[in-house]
Amino acid sequence: MSELLKNYGLDEMDRQSLLHPLTSIVDHQKSGPRIISSGSGVTLKDPSGRSILDCSGGLWCVNVGYGRPELAEAAKQAILELSFFHLFSSSSHAPAIQLADRLLSLFHRGGATHLSKVFFGTSGSDANDTAFKLVRYYNNLRGLPAKKKIISREGAYHGVTVASGSLTGIAAYHKAFDLPLPGVIHTSCPHYFRFANDGESEADFCDRLINEIEAIIAREGPETIAAFIAEPIMGTGGVLVPPAGYFSRLQAVLKEHDILLIADEVITGFGRLGTWFATEFYDLKPDIVSLAKGVTSAYFPMSVSMISERIWQVLEQASPDVGPVMHGFTYSGHPVGASIALVNLSILEDEGLVANAANMGAYLKAGLKDRVADHRFVGEVRGEGLMIAVELSADKDRRIPFARAAGAHRIVANKAFEHGLLIRPSPFIEALAFSPPLCITKDECDRSLDLFVAALAAATPELDALSGSRAAA
């Protein structure tokens, strides 16, 4: 035990030793860490033994819940059998081969039979980095070196590396990092409640979004636009559900101009929406799919990049001339991670957790609508499956948000944590996300509703004081 731990404990050791991701340094030094000591199912415990109902699912990722002995055993056996080997230079091993085959089977079963090959990484960010590079590689191999630009969307979250952070459409992730890179274009956020014009119907809003995308393609030249990247439902941005018809119309535009579609399913994949993948939910036919989080339920860092037969054919045909695909990571297809993923997928299937996400998601959303939708500071309750948000509004009738600096949703999130409920405030709009493990029960949904109602009531006096602090109408 270090002298620091003996003298001060974990709280001070944390402040002295850790640089936390996505954390205010000055606030952290004042208040210290929020330490979690254990987890089981949907429940976390802090060092004092206090229980916290985790309706954030870690970071949208603990799909099968905490403390699964089957996954611990899978990790143990994999470590004992083959603790590591790589996939470079035609090397392989059974766990990676079997996982790739199983993932393709899951997608094909859902109708995405055009997906052909699997590449492994370690995080959602690097999966989108891989997509970024493959788009360039693909068009270079086709003799189209000018076709490199990627369209993303305001409010999107695609990661924090230089490439994936550029694709992210939230300004806070760009500030002081000299992002985004040239060649990344952000179009309007498809969130009707917040961004529709006064009197604009959802159909008219969708028209405007598609017209804007077509105008960007015309302005930049379709010969320069390589891909469009989209989360089927935008997670970190605030659980932003697209307007009806958005994706069918978008795909038609992209097809017309030979533009690839990258589906970022890092959050939506592996049952979160009540279907295995959002490609099935929205009838998407993406050329690249980025996955992570739920593939191992965060028991091991692993990501997946699926590519279409269309892309594979170009790579295969060019191989004699260009040589190896010079992209990969030491831990691509790690045998321990792949072994955990295979058991994790079996748990999702055997316990019916995808169907449970659909059923419990509908129950939780209905409960939120019934119990808080009429609250004067709740603008909208929305979502699909176990991906739900409550958006706050200073003036719900006119859809006027609280001033960003006021942090109204963070106040509610902090009150929720005090009451024993963990939910996540968005860094883009004043929305609170509910994304519990897919094993959540009806009783746990009821408890989360009770805790949230109590937290919102406790926060209301502060929201009253802030309601005069509004963003411009």
Regions found by a protein language model. Name each.
Residues 2-473:
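Conserved N-terminal phosphate-binding loop of PLP-dependent enzymes in the Aspartate aminotransferase
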